[in-house]
């Protein structure tokens, strides 16, 4: 699927939902233009906030032959370029920023979704067989199964036999869920309903792994299960969300190749609203073809 197809899907889904169709971006931000970022700086300072835009735009190459080229390169990407060297080693500020980003990623994995968050969103909360974060990180197999209490809650409080069941889970990034939820779930649910699909009761699974959607789909009798789960964070990027969609999942027979994945959903990747439109189109095609993953025809 190329960019033009994605844009057409977004326009058609947003229009059917009665929302404003995204307008073409201004020339300054069209393809070929340089992304906006803080002005590059070459000053090394221990007082600089290592998570700030200024620190990310820092240029560590001393006495460059073509400073304008480095400035242009630094403005064009969020990658770790132009950091310079001190002999064979990285500059102090480059190393400190690397360590800070690594620490931020570890914090994201270890953080918990606040208990009040699910209540504030009006979501039913269930959990896997996992009881705490340490067990979640060391026993991924238990994160693939619902607790007995969760199974009872789904059977008593959720719509049975829906066309599409949407599930939200913290996964390995709490920030991915809390930062993107309001921009992806409401338009996703609205788009699915606008498409005439029977949508199940959305709910939140604490300590869930991707394969838990197989058990959920089997219990609820869902034709399509869509799992929105936090991705393992990268350095300096802790808000990336993934969508795993599967048709008619079964615990015993569904394999990873049966899933269709849309990853890198965040403001610096695929915008959540755009991802919602693409997921709606994906769910419709899954129901039409009665397939997902590698079994779908393009």
UniProtKB/Swiss-Prot annotation:
The keyword Lyase applies. Binds between the large and small subunits. Its EC number is 4.3.1.7. Keywords: Bacterial microcompartment, Cobalamin, Cobalt, Lyase. It holds the Pfam family EutC. Its main location: other. One of its GO terms (molecular function) is ethanolamine ammonia-lyase activity. It catalyses: ethanolamine = acetaldehyde + NH4(+). Pathway: Amine and polyamine degradation; ethanolamine degradation. It is found in: Bacterial microcompartment. Belongs to the EutC family. Catalyzes the deamination of various vicinal amino-alcohols to oxo compounds. Allows this organism to utilize ethanolamine as the sole source of nitrogen and carbon in the presence of external vitamin B12. This is Ethanolamine ammonia-lyase small subunit. It comes from Salmonella typhi. The gene is eutC.
């Amino acid at each position: 699927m190329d960019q033009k197809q994605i844009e057409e899907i977004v326009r058609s889904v947003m229009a059917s939902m009665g929302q404003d169709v995204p307008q073409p971006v201004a020339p300054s931000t069209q393809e070929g233009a340089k992304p906006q970022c803080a002005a590059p700086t070459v000053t090394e300072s221990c007082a600089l906030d290592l998570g700030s835009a200024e620190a990310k735009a820092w240029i560590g190459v001393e006495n460059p032959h073509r400073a304008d080229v480095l400035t242009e390169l630094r403005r064009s990407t969020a990658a770790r370029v132009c950091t310079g060297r001190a002999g064979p080693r990285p500059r102090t500020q480059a190393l400190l920023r690397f360590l800070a980003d690594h620490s931020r990623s570890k914090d994201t994995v270890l953080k918990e979704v606040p208990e009040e968050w699910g209540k504030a969103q009006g979501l039913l909360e269930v959990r896997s067989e996992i009881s705490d974060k340490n067990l979640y990180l060391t026993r991924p197999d238990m994160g693939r199964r619902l607790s007995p209490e969760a199974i009872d809650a789904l059977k008593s409080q959720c719509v049975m036999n829906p066309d599409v069941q949407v599930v939200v889970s913290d996964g390995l990034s709490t920030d991915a869920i809390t930062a993107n939820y309001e921009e992806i779930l409401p338009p996703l649910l609205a788009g699915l309903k606008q498409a005439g699909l029977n949508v199940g009761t959305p709910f939140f699974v604490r300590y869930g792994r991707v394969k838990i959607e197989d058990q959920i789909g089997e219990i609820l009798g869902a034709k399509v299960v869509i799992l929105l789960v936090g991705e393992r964070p990268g350095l300096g990027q802790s808000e990336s969300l993934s969508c795993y969609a599967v048709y008619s999942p079964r615990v015993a027979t569904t394999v990873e190749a049966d899933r269709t994945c849309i990853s890198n959903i965040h403001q610096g990747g695929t915008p959540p609203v755009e991802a919602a439109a693409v997921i709606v189109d994906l769910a419709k095609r899954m129901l039409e073809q009665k397939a997902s993953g590698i079994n779908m025809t393009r």
